[in-house]
UniProtKB/Swiss-Prot annotation:
Pathway(s) this gene product operates in, as recorded in its UniProt entry: Organic acid metabolism; propanoate degradation
Protein name as it appears in the record: 2-methylisocitrate lyase
Matching PANTHER family: CARBOXYVINYL-CARBOXYPHOSPHONATE PHOSPHORYLMUTASE, CHLOROPLASTIC, PHOSPHOENOLPYRUVATE CARBOXYLASE
Binding site for Mg(2+): D85, D87
SUPFAM superfamilies found in the cross-reference section: Phosphoenolpyruvate/pyruvate domain (SSF51621)
Catalytic activity: (2S,3R)-3-hydroxybutane-1,2,3-tricarboxylate = pyruvate + succinate
Function: Involved in the catabolism of short chain fatty acids (SCFA) via the 2-methylcitrate cycle I (propionate degradation route). Catalyzes the thermodynamically favored C-C bond cleavage of (2R,3S)-2-methylisocitrate to yield pyruvate and succinate via an alpha-carboxy-carbanion intermediate.
Additional comment: In vitro, dithiothreitol (DTT) or reduced glutathione (GSH) are required for optimal activity.
Keyword flag Zinc: no
Assembly mode: Homotetramer; dimer of dimers.
Temperature dependence as stated in the record: Optimum temperature is 50 degrees Celsius.
Gene from which this protein is expressed: prpB
PROSITE patterns to which the protein is assigned, alphabetical: ISOCITRATE_LYASE
Class of enzymatic activity (EC top level): lyase
Length: 295
């Protein structure tokens, strides 16, 4: 296996930065913006695919193909290692999970997380979640680990058990998931910093903290997370939320005032856009090709 596989790049980033900040990229353009800002890893949110690409809620409606489309668009242009939200594995059988792992890895992702919610899943920070048995989730993880062909591809287990069964049961699940082969752990909707320390002590694998806005988890700083032995800080939809609010403002002002003059200051300039997508390099290449064609 190549030493430069996406999975190895993700693990290398994790080794260099503590905690590793992983930002959500709703599309390929945002992936490039994250790269320019200096991030070492990016994330594709299942809720982001549903809301951003499909205009639908995060209730298990998106398909594997929906996710693969967005993965390919990102990995085609951005070299940063990509962590992907694989929900419950896009199907109820081990074969579904295996197909999901193989497909996501083939599309160029570095890592995925798979969760222990039931098929009719909900956003991890909403009420009335339901989870499968510990044994069923262990089977999902085993199927995922068995399906990968690159040992560096990261299989991360997410558990939503805290809100459903309590901390001790969630810790018990965490240990079982690691024993089943999970490389890293994503305890969802954590409410206290000390809980992360418990997961880190029990699991003895890298722990991810989902620092999403307007949810159950406080907006802990990287210093606070580091003190709690958190290895990864995830910001799944921060830029997406800001983008949506900016779009709402522009649409409203343009409709009400008949001009965009009063919102120009919040817009990315033409030159800034071109620089972020390497427009000028493409243009220079095009000019060179036409010069060669004429000569």
């Amino acid at each position: 296996m190549s030493l430069h596989s996406p999975g190895q790049a993700f693990r290398a980033a994790l080794a260099k930065e503590n905690p590793l900040q992983i930002v959500g990229a709703i599309n390929a353009n945002h992936a490039l913006l994250a790269q320019r800002a200096g991030y070492q890893a990016i994330y594709l949110s299942g809720g982001g695919v549903a809301a951003g690409s499909l205009g639908l809620p995060d209730l298990g409606i998106s398909t594997l193909d929906d996710v693969l489309t967005d993965i390919r668009r990102i990995t085609d242009v951005c070299p940063l290692p990509l962590l992907v939200d694989a929900d419950i594995g896009f199907g109820s059988s081990a074969f579904n999970v295996a197909r999901t792992v193989k497909s996501i890895a083939k599309a160029g992702a570095a890592a995925l997380h798979i969760e222990d919610q039931v098929g009719a899943k909900r956003c991890g920070h909403r009420p009335n979640k339901a989870i499968v048995s510990k044994e069923e989730m262990v089977d999902r993880i085993r199927a995922a680990v068995d399906a990968r062909t690159d040992p560096n591809f990261v299989i991360m287990a997410r558990t939503d058990a805290l809100a459903v069964e309590g901390l001790e049961a969630a810790l018990d699940r965490a240990q079982a998931y690691v024993d089943a082969g999970a490389d890293m752990l994503f305890p969802e909707a954590i409410t206290e910093l000390s809980m992360y320390r418990r997961f880190a002590d029990v699991a003895q694998v890298p722990i991810l903290a989902n620092i999403t806005e307007f949810g159950a988890t406080p907006l802990f700083t990287t210093d606070e997370l580091r003190s709690a032995h958190v290895a990864m800080a995830l910001y799944p939809l921060s830029a997406f939320r800001a983008m949506n609010r900016a779009a709402e403002k522009v649409y409203t002002v343009l409709r009400q005032e008949g001009t965009q003059k009063n919102v120009i200051d919040i817009m990315q300039t033409r030159n800034e856009l071109y620089e972020s997508i390497n427009y000028y390099q493409f243009e220079e290449k095009l000019d060179a090709l036409y010069r060669n064609k004429k000569s």
